[in-house]
Regions:
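Hydrophobic membrane-insertion alpha-helices, especially the h-region
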Residues: 5-26
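PDZ/PDZ-like peptide-tail recognition elements
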Residues: 31-60, 67-73, 91-147, 222-291
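Terminal peptide-recognition signature
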Residues: 130, 152, 159-162, 191, ...
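Short, ordered loop/turn segments at secondary-structure junctions
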Residues: 148, 167, 196, 294, ...
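Conserved PDZ fold ligand-binding element
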Residues: 152-174, 194, 310, 317-323
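PDZ-domain C-terminal substructure recognizer with occasional recognition of PDZ-binding tails
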Residues: 178-234, 333-359, 364-370
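Glycine- and Gly-Pro-enriched alpha-helical subdomains that act as flexible
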Residues: 262, 275-278, 282, 288, ...
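C-terminal soluble interaction/assembly domains
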Residues: 300-323, 332-337, 341-352, 356
Length: 370
């Protein structure tokens, strides 16, 4: 075979081999793309996204859309060629797998975490909105989680309100920890709880709202968690996580299924305020979308996947987009045409921006582009 032909054949075979490798070789990346948006003032599946009972609510117009991203699963790994194609597209974000799914996390683990973050976000959204409106918000100490196989399993349940430990009233997490750890491992601790309504009514163990004393044996911390720090390893534990649950003078339900994560907090707060404000009509009929976590005091925090959320908002028809200040640098790298990015740090600031949008005085809006 002539040398030239042999060289061309070798080059062709090498190219084919490289193409095969690029198609078959998997790389540790995750792909994000624009997800659906939901109008917090509207309906989803025939039901209001935000429904209020026990208090007057008022008609609204326009849109206050929360935005989402779609993410490939924990087990998915794109081929090298698919990852390269994703890097070249504006509507796909390719990120290291561990940035989205910590090592060892399964789809079920991720779904559970996202659901917990979403529930926490809903709670903070209600709290921040009512504080903004001057409505009193209460709090109570609850069981947040029960460790599988722990002494508390089957005795205490997530959602139970903790009223006292060993007969002494408790109102903080630290008080519960102190009351349990003063025992020697093996000794019982008596929790006075108000069982969560679902368990109390369903099991017939107690009337909803009734107090009951629940004795729970203790074990050493290291018996439940071999990785417990040395200073805690020998302390008595029962295997629960505790936290604070807010209480409200009326019912605010957020009815979205199959949505997770904490990033809708700001938009939920705005939707709640709009529905509770007589004649408020925060948007003035405009299409506003946005994202951002929110804490109980109305502070807005950063989120992931901002570039994909901007595309989702633009495709849905949004004209304005609330953007957490910490996300502005990334967001301004590729702003979709016709979308105005409003820099946002607080719920109060977002409300002031809506007032400017409603009045048409948009030139002074705090913009990410400035």
């Amino acid at each position: 075979m002539p040398r030239r032909s042999a060289t061309m054949l070798a080059a062709t075979l090498l190219l084919i081999a490289l193409l095969c490798v690029s198609v078959l070789m998997k790389v540790p990346y995750t792909e994000m793309s624009p997800g659906p948006t939901y109008n917090t003032l509207g309906n989803q599946g025939g039901k209001p996204v935000i429904s209020i009972s026990g208090r007057d609510s008022y008609p609204t117009t326009g849109h206050l859309n929360m935005t989402t991203v779609q993410v490939t699963g924990a087990k998915y790994e794109p081929s090298l060629v698919n990852a390269v194609v994703g890097w070249l597209r504006d509507d796909v974000l390719v990120v290291p797998h561990d940035n989205v799914y910590p090592k060892g996390q399964s789809d079920a683990d991720a779904k559970k975490q996202n659901a917990e973050e979403f529930a926490s976000s809903e709670d903070s959204a209600r709290t921040a909105a009512l504080k903004q409106l001057g409505v009193p918000v209460g709090s109570e100490l609850i069981v947040k989680s029960v460790t599988a196989g722990a002494p508390a399993e089957g005795k205490l349940h997530a959602g139970d309100q903790i009223v006292a430990v060993d007969g002494a009233p408790v109102t903080t997490v630290d008080q519960v920890v102190a009351a349990v750890t003063r025992h020697k491992p093996g000794e019982p601790v008596v929790f006075t709880v108000v069982p969560r309504v679902k368990d109390a009514a369903g099991n017939g163990a107690a009337d909803p709202g009734a107090r009951t004393d629940v004795p729970v044996p203790t074990v050493r911390a290291k018996d439940l968690d071999p990785k417990a720090p040395a200073e805690r390893a020998e302390l008595a534990v029962v295997g629960i996580g505790t936290g604070i649950r807010h209480t409200y003078p009326f019912q605010i339900d957020i009815g979205l299924q199959d949505v997770g994560g904490p990033s809708a907090g700001l938009m939920f707060s705005l939707g709640i305020i709009d529905k509770l404000t007589p004649g408020g009509d925060l948007t003035g009929g405009k299409f506003v979308a946005g994202t951002g976590t929110i804490d109980d005091d109305g502070k807005v925090g950063p989120i992931g996947g901002i570039s994909m959320k901007l595309i989702a908002a633009r495709d849905a028809g949004a004209e304005y987009f609330f953007t957490p200040s910490s996300n502005c640098a990334e967001a301004t790298k590729n702003i979709p045409s016709g979308l105005n990015l409003i820099k946002t740090d607080t719920l109060d600031g977002a409300l002031k921006s809506l007032e400017q949008i409603r009045s048409g005085q948009t030139s002074a809006l705090p913009s990410c582009a400035k």
